[in-house]
Every structure is written in C-alpha cells, then in structure tokens.
C-alpha cells in the first residue's frame, strides 16, 4: 500500500499497486465498530462479503469494479478499481446547476448501472450525488452499493436501520415498504432534480424533518429541468406502481444526452476522486 486516500467512520481507503498484475488499485478496510456483539460482527462480515461479491459480479462500465474481498480479523478488506475524478455532489456544489444535457449524461450512466445491478438482484438503496463519480476523462461511475456506509449519513433501510441520505429516500422506504428497483428509480429522480436545480428536492435540515417531507409534501417545481422535466416528474411519483421505470426513462435521457447542445461533463485532474473531498466519503 502506498498512501492513505481517506479515512471515515466506517473504514480507511489506501492507494496501492497490485504486484501480480502491476495495476493501480484502491484498498478499503471496513472497520468493525466497537461495542458490537459477536452476532452483530458476524452479520457485518457476512453482509459485506455478500454485497462485495455481488458487485464484483456486475459487468457494467458504470460501476466501480471490485476485484477481491478478504476477511481478516481487523475487518473486511475490499480491493477495487482506482478511479480518478470528483463526486457529482462536489461538481454541483461548484457549478450550481448542470444543463439538462449534462444531467441526462449522468442519468444515462446511473440508470445503466442500476439496471445491471437490478438484473443481478441488487438494489442500491443509496443513490445520491455523493455516490456518483465524474472522471477526469468524462467517465461516470456509480459507487457504494451498500458495501460500507457511514451511519453519519442517515437513510432508512428495509431493516429499519438509519444509513445513507434521507434527502434521496423513496417515500415507500420511509413508511416501511420493502426496498426494490422502483425505490432506486425514485432516488435517481431526486439526483436528476439536484443536477438541474442545484439542490435536492427534499431537504429540511434534519433527517427526521426531511423524511417527513418526502412522505407528505408534494414534489417541488423544477423549472430548470428543460427536456428532462417529464423524466424527473415521472421518477418522482410517490406511488411506486405509477412511477416511471428505468427502461422507459433511459431512451428519453439518451436523446437529451446525445443532443449536441448537451455539454460534455468532465472534471479537472486536480481533484481526484481517489482522494475523498470529505473524510467520510470512501469511494467503493
């Protein structure tokens, strides 16, 4: 291992070199929080192994590749692709709003990654701008498939645990309905909303207030959505059975992204995603 890329409440990431294949990699060690019972530790290891193996089986250019996973006593270790760029959250923070063409380019990548995951029986559960990487070459990757999430970023999972980001939480998840692909579709709608409006659709300052708003409040207007307006509106329908599905949203987004007026989205090499902008944001 060569250098520490970032430390967070759930683990540490290093840059390293695979000495067999001579390629750069990122290595994440998932911490075992103190105070857990033996059963809780076993479940943490089992969940990490199961999800890391599932992500490793995905064949998508839009997913950060997992090469290997190990289980030493100190905590699970995940060997993964080293992808240089910035998070979409940081791009939005710096530029304010993306064009509809740029947002559609992101949407195509994220939706494609989600379709590959859903086909493999995986639901992401935490789609948000902080979990999307924009590469220095314009490549886009979806990260954090539940391998290691920080409890400092609240979301409600199907088990009732609070993990992730409430601002992009599907309303049915907040009310206890099991998580599924349509929940990821809602979160993609929230992500696209943030791209074109510069803020999430629901954010009331605290996780509890935000979750209540997701469940009860109407979806805010999105006047800057442009040609993505019907996609965002369709993905953010609160009734899952009425919500736009990814296979319907993708062709629309491709048309918008392929339009010459859509600016190619890149990030500067001075801000590599391998060095997290936030200590708790560990890309994997």
Give the residues covered by each predicted segment.
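Eukaryotic protein kinase
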Residues: 1-269
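C-terminal or otherwise distal, non-catalytic regulatory regions appended to signaling enzyme catalytic cores
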Residues: 273-284
């Amino acid at each position: 291992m060569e250098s520490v890329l970032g430390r967070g409440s759930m683990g540490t990431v290093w840059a390293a070199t695979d000495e067999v294949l001579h390629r750069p990699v990122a290595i994440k060690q998932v911490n075992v929080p103190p105070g857990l019972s033996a059963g809780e530790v076993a479940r943490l290891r089992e969940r990490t192994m199961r999800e890391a193996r599932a992500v490793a089986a995905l064949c998508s250019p839009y997913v950060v590749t997992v090469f290997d996973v190990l289980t030493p006593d100190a905590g699970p270790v995940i060997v993964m692709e080293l992808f240089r760029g910035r998070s979409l959250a940081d791009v939005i923070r710096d530029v304010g709003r993306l064009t509809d063409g740029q947002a559609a380019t992101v949407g195509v990548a994220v939706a494609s990654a989600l379709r590959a995951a859903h086909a493999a029986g995986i639901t992401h559960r935490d789609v948000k701008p902080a979990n999307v990487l924009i590469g220095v070459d314009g490549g886009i990757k979806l990260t954090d498939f539940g391998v290691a999430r920080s409890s400092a970023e609240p979301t409600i999972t199907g088990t009732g645990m609070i993990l992730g980001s409430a601002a992009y939480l599907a309303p049915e998840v907040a009310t206890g309905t099991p998580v599924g692909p349509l929940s990821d579709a809602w979160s993609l709608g929230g992500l696209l909303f943030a791209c074109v409006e510069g803020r999430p659709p629901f954010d009331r300052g605290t996780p509890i207030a935000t979750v209540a708003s997701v469940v009860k409040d109407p979806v805010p207007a999105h006047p800057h959505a442009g040609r993505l307006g019907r996609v965002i509106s369709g993905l953010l329908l609160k009734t899952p059975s009425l919500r736009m599905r990814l296979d319907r949203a993708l062709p629309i987004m491709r048309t918008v992204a392929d339009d010459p007026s859509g600016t190619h989205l890149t990030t500067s090499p001075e801000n590599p995603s391998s060095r997290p902008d936030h200590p708790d944001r560990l890309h994997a």
